[in-house]
């Protein structure tokens, strides 16, 4: 095996990388484009590198951290992931986004007693920043209003 392949294996033992990230890392280490492509092909052929596995793990981690589909989608696009792959994996979670947004809201604002108009706007902006769309946010606040009697 080549030095580029060995270097790729060392990187992949630490964490998952997208194909683009792995290529960039190997190029930073000074390997030629041809060596990088060969190492990437070999890693994919042997199942050591998989964009599908990377996307599934990345989405699971980011959901657990309280991020929504819009932010996750943008981050994955920046990592060079195919938009169709992103959409197919995010689509598996489509029924859960309200629960994820509610969990993010509760983590940040559960102890809050102030439900003034400006405070609710601040909380909605927080969820928007986290990557949840307006439909999900409106459902969250309907749930919050019924639960907390706003």
From Swiss-Prot:
Record keywords: Cytoplasm
Pfam families: RecX_HTH1 (PF21982), RecX_HTH2 (PF02631), RecX_HTH3 (PF21981)
Any GO BP annotation: regulation of DNA repair
Cross-referenced InterPro entries: RecX_HTH_1st, RecX_HTH_2nd, RecX_HTH_3rd, Regulatory_RecX, WH-like_DNA-bd_sf
Keyword Cytoplasm annotated: yes
Annotated localization: Cytoplasm
Chief place where the protein resides: cytoplasm
GO cellular component labels: cytoplasm
Family to which this protein belongs: Belongs to the RecX family.
UniProt function note: Modulates RecA activity.
HAMAP family on file: RecX
Protein name: Regulatory protein RecX
Organism: Legionella pneumophila (strain Corby)
Gene name tied to this protein: recX
């Amino acid at each position: 095996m080549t030095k580029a392949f060995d270097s790729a294996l060392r990187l992949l033992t630490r964490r998952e990388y997208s194909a683009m990230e792995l290529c960039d890392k190997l190029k930073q280490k000074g390997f030629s484009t041809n060596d990088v492509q060969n190492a990437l092909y070999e890693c994919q052929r042997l199942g050591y590198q998989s964009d599908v596995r990377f996307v599934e793990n990345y989405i699971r981690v980011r959901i657990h951290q309280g991020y929504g589909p819009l932010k996750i989608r943008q981050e994955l696009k920046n990592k060079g992931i195919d938009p169709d792959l992103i959409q197919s994996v995010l689509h598996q979670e489509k029924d859960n986004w309200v629960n994820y947004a509610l969990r993010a809201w509760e983590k940040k604002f559960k102890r809050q007693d102030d439900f003034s108009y400006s405070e609710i706007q601040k909380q909605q902006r927080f969820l928007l920043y986290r990557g949840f769309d307006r439909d999900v946010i409106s459902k969250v606040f309907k749930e919050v209003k019924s639960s907390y009697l706003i």
